[in-house]
């Protein structure tokens, strides 16, 4: 059977097209259709969105795996957070990553936008720890 196989442990979380699933036992599942999903450490809770980069990631997470009703508002939020961060930062690296992230989000490439947002978080962490 074709598809993407995922192995999850008891307590792991998976979000598929807006549905949050928590596994009570170890499981192996196969996603046979094209779906938007995140699992494990890819999922950020609202209490973790404590910095500008993390707020961008959290909004993009909803763009990627939220319900249809949530996605439009989340994209507006993500673009707002990206624009605010870009206006405030002096880092050319951050501005470049922010521009790429916004373009990916606006063109429907949610997972790519999340990967770029993780790079922005790492950059932000490195700058703030100096």
Task: Identify the residue ranges that each predicted region occupies.
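Terminal leader/tail segments of proteins
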Residues: 1-130
């Amino acid at each position: 059977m074709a598809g993407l196989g995922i192995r999850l442990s008891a307590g792991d979380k998976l979000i598929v097209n807006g549905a949050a699933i928590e596994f009570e036992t170890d499981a192996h599942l196969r996603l046979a259709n094209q779906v938007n999903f995140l699992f494990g450490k890819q999922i950020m809770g609202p209490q973790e969105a404590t910095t500008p980069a993390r707020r961008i990631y959290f909004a993009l997470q909803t763009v990627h795996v939220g319900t249809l009703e949530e996605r439009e508002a989340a994209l507006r939020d993500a673009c707002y957070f990206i624009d605010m961060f870009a206006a405030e930062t002096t880092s050319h690296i951050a501005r470049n990553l922010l521009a790429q992230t916004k373009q990916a989000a606006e063109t429907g490439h949610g997972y790519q936008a999340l990967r770029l947002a993780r790079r922005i978080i790492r950059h932000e962490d490195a700058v703030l720890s100096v």
